[in-house]
Amino acid sequence: MAVKDYYKVQGDSVTRLKQFCPRCGPGVFLADHKNRLACGKCGYTEFKK
């Protein structure tokens, strides 16, 4: 998946479609799995409810 797919542009505004990793900071996105969000860089995982 290309980085351009992580953002959505509507008119003059840009919105992020994926969350940043809270450990790694801005620029490192969390992968969206069926039951969790995971960082491929540091291994951080958040389970969905």
Curated annotation (Swiss-Prot):
Question: Which GO CC annotations does the UniProt entry carry?
Answer: ribonucleoprotein complex; ribosome
Task: Tell me a Gene Ontology molecular-function term this record carries.
Answer: structural constituent of ribosome
Metal-binding among keywords:
yes
What the entry lists under Gene3D superfamilies is as follows: 6.20.50.180
User: Cofactor note from UniProt?
Assistant: Binds 1 zinc ion per subunit.
Q: Where does Zn(2+) bind?
A: C21, C24, C39, C42
Report C4-type zinc finger ranges: 21-42
Whether Metal-binding counts among this entry's keywords is: yes
Q: Which SUPFAM superfamilies match?
A: Zn-binding ribosomal proteins (SSF57829)
Cofactor dependence is on:
Zn(2+)
What interactions and quaternary structure are annotated?
Answer: Part of the 30S ribosomal subunit.
Q: Which family does it belong to?
A: Belongs to the eukaryotic ribosomal protein eS31 family.
Q: What is this protein called?
A: Small ribosomal subunit protein eS31
Q: Which gene encodes it?
A: rps27ae
